[in-house]
């Protein structure tokens, strides 16, 4: 999974069993990447994927991830706490209480121009459905939004 950290550092994170488990540094501040991997080792549930979202609203970009994740053509995943979304990751499952956070990772042309999301698919009931291509909604998603 591609990752752009707040300081602009880029990495590819490895996902196993629904969790970030390490990865490869690409560019930027190597210490940022190493600190993230060390945190995953100390407290593995901080890297658990707990949300996948697709923007569905025709709105202008605000520069605030919490709002921009809702804009049509964006996709985001989140790690960490998921109990507020009906998930099972509650604060007591973290090794360190300060790590019991919900961290959104937004993919959008204005936010992550270095990362190209060519296609997003959902695999359900043995079938793949394309939801987005090149930050644009697929006909399937457009039909759902009509």
Task: Enumerate the predicted regions with their spans.
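Metal/cofactor-centered catalytic core regions of large enzymes
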Residues: 1-146
């Amino acid at each position: 999974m591609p990752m752009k950290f707040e300081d602009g550092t880029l990495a590819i994170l490895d996902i196993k069993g629904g969790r970030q488990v390490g990865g490869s540094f690409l560019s930027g501040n190597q210490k940022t990447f190493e600190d993230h991997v060390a945190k995953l080792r100390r407290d593995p549930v901080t890297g658990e994927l707990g949300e996948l979202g697709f923007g569905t609203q025709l709105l202008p970009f605000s520069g605030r991830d919490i709002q921009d994740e809702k804009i049509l053509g964006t996709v985001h995943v989140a790690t960490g706490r998921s109990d507020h979304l009906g998930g099972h990751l509650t604060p007591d499952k973290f090794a360190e209480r300060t790590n019991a956070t919900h961290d959104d990772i937004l993919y959008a042309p204005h936010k992550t121009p270095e990362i190209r999301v060519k296609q997003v698919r959902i695999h359900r009931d043995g079938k793949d459905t394309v939801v987005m291509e090149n930050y644009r909604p697929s006909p399937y998603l457009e039909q759902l939004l009509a």
